[in-house]
């Protein structure tokens, strides 16, 4: 069968939806490789797309035997549902943050967003063994390449980003339109941690953000500043429940109760 021509976004970086010229699965799937075709994936997406993704990888002439590891940016079903199947086919390892390991290994449907009863979402979440735990400052070797691990919590408490040269595989921290990954207390979200992670990204000298959803984009400090400012307002809004740190209206109400203020 004819091989596919590789369509890298950057040297040694292929995004498989971009390679296919269409959305194949629920998230971006980054293939990082060295000159000797040692390779790794950051995320895999849904289980029903694994066969197609692996066929694309095969047609790109990356030997399955040279898959170093499967890396989870975080333990959300749209990122990692296919890990168990891919790991079995590739006979490789799974790498993630320690806080992401438990839901991955237990197949926790609630923690991974596979089960959202109120919205009638009921997805399978096959458990998968995690062999490698990494945290901030660690390195993941992919043949001759090396990814620097950043712990960037906020969307989830176990979310990781990965630096390669001037690139940051940035997970669900920030998207090109200024949106961020869902904020949900049940999910381990923290607005304060989100802000800290975004400030770290802003202060860094990375040039490109490679998010887990949507197009790759050049780091824009004004966009990050605007997003941080928005998140800072979330800290004081009842809309975000226990993810907020206070609700100023309650202080105002206390004062008005003491004053005996009548409705206006």
Feature roles, as predicted:
Residues 40-42, 71, 94, 169-170, ...:
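Residue-level marker for buried hydrophobic side chains located in beta-strands
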Residues 46-51, 58-139, 229, 233-237:
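Active-site HxH/HxHxD metal-binding segment of metal-dependent hydrolases
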Residues 240-264:
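C-terminal regulatory/interaction regions
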């Amino acid at each position: 069968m004819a091989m596919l021509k590789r369509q890298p976004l950057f040297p040694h970086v292929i995004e498989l939806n971009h390679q296919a010229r269409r959305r194949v699965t629920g998230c971006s799937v980054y293939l990082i490789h060295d000159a000797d075709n040692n390779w790794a994936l950051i995320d895999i997406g849904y289980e029903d797309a694994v066969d197609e993704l692996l066929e694309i990888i095969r047609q790109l002439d990356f030997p399955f035997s040279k898959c170093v590891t499967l890396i989870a940016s975080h333990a959300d079903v749209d990122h990692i549902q296919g890990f168990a199947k891919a790991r079995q086919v590739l006979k490789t390892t799974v790498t993630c943050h320690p806080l992401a390991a438990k839901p991955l290994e237990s197949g926790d449907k609630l923690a991974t967003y596979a089960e959202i009863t109120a919205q009638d979402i009921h997805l399978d979440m096959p458990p998968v063994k995690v062999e490698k735990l990494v945290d901030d400052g660690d390195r993941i070797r992919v043949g001759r390449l090396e990814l620097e691990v950043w712990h960037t919590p906020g969307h989830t408490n176990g979310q990781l980003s990965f630096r390669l040269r001037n690139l940051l595989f940035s997970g669900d921290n920030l998207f090109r339109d200024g949106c961020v990954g869902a904020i949900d207390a049940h999910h381990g979200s923290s607005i304060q941690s989100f802000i800290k992670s975004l400030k770290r990204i802003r202060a860094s000298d990375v040039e490109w953000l490679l998010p887990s959803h949507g197009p790759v984009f050049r780091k824009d400090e004004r966009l990050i500043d605007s997003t941080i400012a928005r998140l800072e307002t979330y800290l004081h809004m009842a809309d975000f429940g226990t993810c907020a740190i206070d609700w100023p209206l309650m202080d105002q109400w206390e004062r008005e109760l003491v004053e005996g203020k009548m409705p206006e």
